[in-house]
Curated annotation (Swiss-Prot):
Domain of life: Archaea
Subunit description: Monomer.
Lineage: Archaea, Methanobacteriati, Methanobacteriota, Methanomada group, Methanococci
Enzyme Commission number(s) from the entry: 3.1.-.-
Family the UniProt entry places it in: Belongs to the eukaryotic release factor 1 family. Pelota subfamily.
Primary subcellular site in the record, as a coarse category: cytoplasm
GO MF annotations in UniProt: endonuclease activity; metal ion binding
Cofactor: a divalent metal cation
The record's note on its domains: The N-terminal domain has the RNA-binding Sm fold. It harbors the endoribonuclease activity.
Protein name, per record: Protein pelota homolog
GO cellular component: cytoplasm
Gene Ontology annotations of biological process type: nonfunctional rRNA decay; nuclear-transcribed mRNA catabolic process, no-go decay; nuclear-transcribed mRNA catabolic process, non-stop decay; ribosome disassembly; RNA surveillance
Cited function: May function in recognizing stalled ribosomes, interact with stem-loop structures in stalled mRNA molecules, and effect endonucleolytic cleavage of the mRNA. May play a role in the release non-functional ribosomes and degradation of damaged mRNAs. Has endoribonuclease activity.
Length: 348
């Protein structure tokens, strides 16, 4: 995320989202009644051509809308914000509806009553754009699962079988093994960032040696770590271990996974945790909240009613973490009601 300009007297921040992660961050920052300004396409009638029966022509215009619906479309790499027009050229009626498609590299101005957690999220997005992206390959000698680590979740890129079999002779198995390595490398060769190979056995080490010999351009980006499991279980193990943080700096998804692990541990021993809105509100009555945890879905549904609690947490120097439901840790928090807290001290 690039922050272009801040205009405090108007509560406006001009910014440019650079990738899908930034669009996800924006989907959690923009809320109903915020004003959004951007260059967008709008179909307008050609009043000078009365004979044409079509719906007019599309042209680019600078519009402002008051947000009503905010929809993040991962598959289409866009954030759609719909609402009534509040600023437009003279030939476009104020009060009519329009949808602004926010895509990477589109400059957007957001006008709202900026909260500390909104600004913290913008800073996170700005910082994350400077960090290397990470692909994780969880593998052994028979299968490899390839994942892209994003700010808001994990995308499975490929699952590759090795073809190595006890029914084949040594030469055939060697051919199958190198074909397996080649398929893995073809799946990641265009990726710009760090590549983490992990899993049980020596498969990860063998492919590292193969890359060092055959693909020297990729070799500097390769990191190898141990894991006891393959597949998604191995990925979960890696996320909980903190290994991603060593590569990435501090990966948001890794941080979220670790803090939910801590929450579940505290809940299991009836320790420093509260979950569900009633329990969390009770903890706030004692000023006991250290970290308030919300799923992005819960915040979007309840933002107007939950902001007082969020303000109260910040007033006692507590922290707030909004967790994506696109990965397992967020789904675990959702199962707890979508809202929980880590506490400073136990309460009855």
């Amino acid at each position: 995320m690039k922050i272009i300009q801040e205009i405090p007297e108007k509560n406006i921040i001009k910014l440019i989202p650079e990738n899908l992660d930034d669009l996800w961050h924006l989907s959690n920052i923009i809320q109903p009644y915020n004003a959004i300004y951007a260059v967008t396409e709008r179909r307008t009638e050609d009043k000078g051509d009365k004979l044409r029966a079509d719906r007019g022509t599309k042209r680019k215009v600078f519009l402002g809308i008051k947000a009503e619906k905010i929809n993040f479309h991962e598959d289409f790499n866009r954030l759609r914000v719909s609402g009534k027009i509040i600023h437009a050229p003279e030939d476009i009626p104020i009060g009519s509806y329009h949808t602004i498609d926010i895509e990477p590299l589109l400059q957007v101005s957001v006008q709202k009553n900026w909260k500390k957690w909104d600004l913290a999220r913008l800073k996170d997005a700005e910082d994350s754009s400077k960090k290397p992206k990470v692909v994780v390959v969880i593998m052994d000698d028979s299968e490899a699962d390839i994942f892209l680590v994003r700010e808001f979740g994990i995308k499975e890129l490929a699952s590759i079988k090795s073809g190595v079999s006890k029914k084949l002779d040594y030469k055939q198995n060697e051919q199958a093994k190198f074909s397996y390595y080649s398929d893995i490398i073809n799946s990641i060769s265009e990726f710009e960032g760090k590549i983490l190979f992990a899993g049980p056995g020596f498969g990860k080490n063998n492919i590292q040696n193969y890359i060092s010999e055959k693909h020297k351009d990729l070799a500097p980006n390769v990191v190898v770590e141990s894991a006891n499991h393959t597949g998604k279980s191995g990925l979960s193990e890696i996320l909980k271990s903190g290994i991603i943080d060593k590569i990435y700096g501090e990966a948001r998804i890794s941080k979220e996974t670790q803090i939910i692990e801590k929450l579940l541990e505290e809940i299991s021993k009836k320790g420093l945790a509260a979950y569900g809105i009633e329990s969390v509100n009770n903890a706030m009555n004692y000023s006991a909240i250290d970290t308030l945890l919300l799923t992005d879905e819960y915040l979007r549904r309840n933002r107007r009613t939950i902001e007082e609690l969020m303000n109260s947490v910040e007033n006692i120097n507590g922290s707030i973490l909004i967790i994506s439901t696109e990965h397992d840790a967020g789904k675990q928090l959702k199962a707890l009601g979508g809202i929980s807290a880590l506490l400073r001290f136990p309460i009855e």
